[in-house]
Amino acid sequence: MKVYVGCITDRGNYREKNQDRVVCHMSDSKKNLLVAACVCDGIGSFEYSEIASEMMTAGVTRWFQGIKGYYPAVMDAEAVLEDFEVTIRELNELVYTYRMDRGTDIGCTMSALLIMERNYYVFHVGDSRIYLVREQMRQI
């Protein structure tokens, strides 16, 4: 399977700062494809939402760097999925705790895509979306 990746965010026309973050990581193994991608959309009505977006994407990066050497030799796809889901829940809790402890309005939506071999898995926190683009575009 050929995989092409690209990542970009933009602050848009109305914001002074970009509260969005995006990461995409791909294993360098030719045999066992592993891709983790995550886009976080900061909540514009919260002044410091870029903090939440950065916490989430940095957490996905740490997770990928830690897991990539274990798949598939030590962990099968099911174990990787379970570990990723736990990580997303923990990152969401981390953002919530940061907000409560500091009394700071931060928050973001998050959509993540995990690809292992020929299968893909989608994770959401909030209302962001992921699309599959072939001859046409379809929300997944």
Predicted regions and their residues:
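PP2C/PPM-type serine/threonine phosphatase catalytic domain
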Residues: M1-I140
